[in-house]
Amino acid sequence: MSRKLLCLLLCVSLLAFSGCVPVTVSAEDPPVTADEPTPPPNPGPVSAPSLEPKPEPAPEPETSLTPTIEYETYTGDIPHIFIHCLIAYPEVKGNDGNMLYDADCINGTEFRRLLTALYANGYCLIDIHDTFELTADGWRQKESVSVPVGRKPLIFSVDDVTYDQRKRSCGMVDFLGFDENGEFTAGIYRSDGSVEYTKEEFVFILEDFIAEYPDFSSHDARMTLCMTGFTGQFGYRTDIDDDNVDIRDAEIEKAKTVAEQFRALGYTFACHGFGHYDATKLSLRGMEEDLRCVKEQVEPVVGPMTVYVYPYGKTLTPGDSRYEAMLDTGFVEFCSVSHFFYRRDYADGRSLYMTRIGIDGYSLRNYGEALAPLFDVHQIIDTENRK
């Protein structure tokens, strides 16, 4: 054996006893270095995120709480009744033991009974403006109107929605407006300067009734409010007067807000004269001045009006210069007060006429026969507060 081979064998022997353990490597597996982490299992191919928007889930169908009202065409008479603002506090009585304004008004109890009786007898409210139209022959009363199936039309108006300051502490509310929570309400001024809010007025009682009986309102019709202006509107001093110069602008804005609320609910407005004058006693100049005040002080709050409701029911006739002045101002339908219901056209097609019956202490006692088709007066009158 050569010297070189002997040295090589000696080196191999020394390595075998050096304490290093040899690593056996399979010829089938590639070596893995210690400083490289073992790769995770292959999860398979991953799709790229779609750029298309995901479809929104279909909304669940809403369940309507308002019943569907079906309509039909009605041909026949259309009665027109009216009230004044309600007696909210019938306990306030005069020396005769009756409510103040006993002959001219009804109270909240009577108004609720009235609505119930009208509904039971098949009536529903319609908008007075839906009862007439402009045709090729001029203005004409419509021969038919649309009403909920099985119901009969009724026009219902409210006179003097002004809340005259002279009537404070007489059992009526003092104004319509909004409370500290922004809720539409009525209020009275207490002697200590505080305000007491109440819902004992026609608008709130009617809204509650329609919420319960939706078909009492045809096409969302409500009442027609007959406005004067000599002592403001809705309890606010919107009239031009030396006593309210400093507050008038603010009062107008408050009144406008109330008018907007009424319109949103479906109420309409009619003119009841600015000064609530007997038209038959006004001169032509006096009538023109009254109409000017309506245009300048009332319509800016409630909007344009085409229906004129005669104060005291005192009427003028076509051809009268004062009547012509009202036509020139834009009025078309003229309403009086009577103990029977009547509507008519005029041959010239320039205007229309209808009567109304007031619902008040006087008529409840004296017009039972005329009102019998609508309701039984004995079911309405509040005998506890009327003698």
Can you annotate each of these PLM segments?
Residues F17-A34:
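Sec-dependent signal peptide cleavage junction
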Residues E60-I128, R140-S157, Y163-R168, A264, ...:
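C-terminal active-site subregion of NodB/CE4 polysaccharide deacetylases
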Residues F230-Q233, G275-D278, K314-T315:
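Short, catalytically relevant binding-site loops at active-site mouths
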Residues T73-Q261, L265:
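Active-site beta->alpha N-cap acidic-glycine motif
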Residues M1-L5, L9:
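Positively charged n-region of N-terminal signal peptides that target proteins for export
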Residues L10-L15:
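Hydrophobic core
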Residues V32-S64:
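Ser/Thr/Gly/Pro-rich low-complexity, disordered linker/stalk segments of secreted
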